[in-house]
């Protein structure tokens, strides 16, 4: 087994540039397709998860991430599924933190449902994790259990408290769902801003299994913003985090609110990211099915040059934009794979 602390990386190369002149500096890595929740817009209730043999080992994930960092990635986000349910995940995070210490990586972060944060917040902070996103769509315990199918809201809130006590900045991600949580969004904003947390609202995306009621729950954020403007004073700001969100400040709370609108506003012109699955498939776009098998390149050779070439070939196919559209007539997703596999 390669020593991840001592293994030399590939020789420095020019930053990765896609066919449309966009620098790829952000890698999102789904470390597992498993989750302890079953959120209705993310996965089916009775999911069949990948067998262990199909997953990249933690050492392989480290090697892949390290090559991407050598090729110009400055921000690394671990996702899932739920990343903190992957066995020995802190070993991987601890190893990856060496890139923060060397200055090769600007940020190591993760998106989580919060269920495991009370257990891991201190270790995450010790590894240099300074910011995390927590997915939280409602503060109503009954609705929370409905949308997550299995989730316990109190456990998530305990996790958020633990993260903040560990000096980790928490941002709340909420999917806006028509006739489910739309009336609660102002309350969620006040609650989060009152605790020093930004909020980002997200439109539901047509990925994976789409049930009839889910299609009907699509809520354009343009409508949400108009509703919020009747209660709050919103001011556009140029704040950016390297992602697709457009931000406003809310005068009444003093906090920031982001909008991610893949369905009503195409943010592709500034896309700086690619997504790696736990099986080693690289997706150049969340809303396209084109992929590259990096597991094959990873296991064919100990040479990182071979892996680097496979990454370059994949980046050369990064598309101009996504294909998201909700097909109400046929009730089918525009992208068949589940968000839990691609990484939310």
Curated annotation (Swiss-Prot):
InterPro entries: Aldolase_TIM, Elp3/MiaA/NifB-like_rSAM, MoaA, MoaA_NifB_PqqE_Fe-S-bd_CS, MoaA_twitch, MoCo_biosynth_MoaA/MoaC, rSAM
Single GO MF annotation: cyclic pyranopterin monophosphate synthase activity
Catalytic activity: GTP + AH2 + S-adenosyl-L-methionine = (8S)-3',8-cyclo-7,8-dihydroguanosine 5'-triphosphate + 5'-deoxyadenosine + L-methionine + A + H(+)
Obligatory cofactor(s): [4Fe-4S] cluster
Signal peptide boundaries: none
Residue positions binding S-adenosyl-L-methionine: 41, 81, 135, 205
Membrane-spanning ranges: none
The keyword Magnesium belongs to this UniProt entry's keyword annotation: no
Binding residues for [4Fe-4S] cluster 2: 268, 271, 285
Subunit structure as annotated in this protein's UniProt entry: Monomer and homodimer.
Role this protein plays: Catalyzes the cyclization of GTP to (8S)-3',8-cyclo-7,8-dihydroguanosine 5'-triphosphate.
HAMAP family: MoaA_B
Similarity section: Belongs to the radical SAM superfamily. MoaA family.
Protein known as: GTP 3',8-cyclase
Species the sequence originates in: Brucella abortus (strain 2308)
């Amino acid at each position: 087994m390669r020593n991840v602390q001592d293994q030399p990386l590939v020789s420095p190369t020019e930053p990765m540039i896609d066919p449309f002149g966009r620098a790829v500096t952000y890698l999102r890595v789904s470390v597992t397709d498993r989750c302890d929740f079953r959120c209705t817009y993310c996965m089916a209730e009775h999911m069949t998860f990948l067998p262990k043999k199909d997953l990249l080992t933690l050492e392989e994930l480290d090697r892949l991430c390290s090559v991407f960092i050598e090729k110009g990635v400055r921000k690394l986000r671990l996702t899932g599924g739920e990343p903190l349910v992957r066995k020995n995940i802190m070993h991987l995070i601890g190893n990856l933190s060496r890139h923060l210490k060397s200055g090769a990586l600007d940020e190591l972060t993760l998106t989580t449902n919060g269920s495991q944060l009370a257990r891991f917040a201190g270790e995450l902070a010790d590894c240099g994790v300074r910011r995390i996103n927590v997915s939280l769509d409602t503060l109503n315990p009954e609705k929370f259990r409905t949308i997550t199918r299995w989730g316990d809201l109190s456990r998530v809130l305990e996790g958020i408290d633990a993260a903040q006590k560990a000096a980790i900045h928490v941002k709340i991600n909420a999917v806006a769902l028509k006739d489910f949580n739309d009336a609660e969004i102002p309350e969620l904003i006040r609650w989060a801003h009152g605790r020093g947390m930004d909020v980002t609202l997200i439109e539901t995306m047509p990925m994976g299994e789409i049930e009839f009621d889910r299609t009907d729950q699509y809520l354009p954020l343009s409508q949400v913003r108009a509703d919020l403007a009747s209660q709050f004073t919103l001011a556009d700001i140029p704040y950016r985090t390297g992602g697709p969100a457009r931000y406003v400040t809310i005068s009444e709370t003093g906090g920031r609110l982001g909008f991610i609108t893949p369905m009503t506003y195409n943010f592709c012109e500034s896309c700086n990211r690619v997504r790696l699955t736990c099986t080693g498939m690289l997706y150049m776009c969340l809303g396209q099915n084109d992929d590259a098998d990096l597991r094959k390149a990873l296991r064919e050779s100990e040479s990182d040059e071979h892996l680097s070439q496979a990454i370059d070939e994949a980046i050369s196919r990064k598309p101009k934009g996504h294909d998201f559209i909700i097909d109400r007539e046929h009730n089918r997703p525009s992208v068949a794979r589940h968000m839990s596999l691609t990484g939310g």
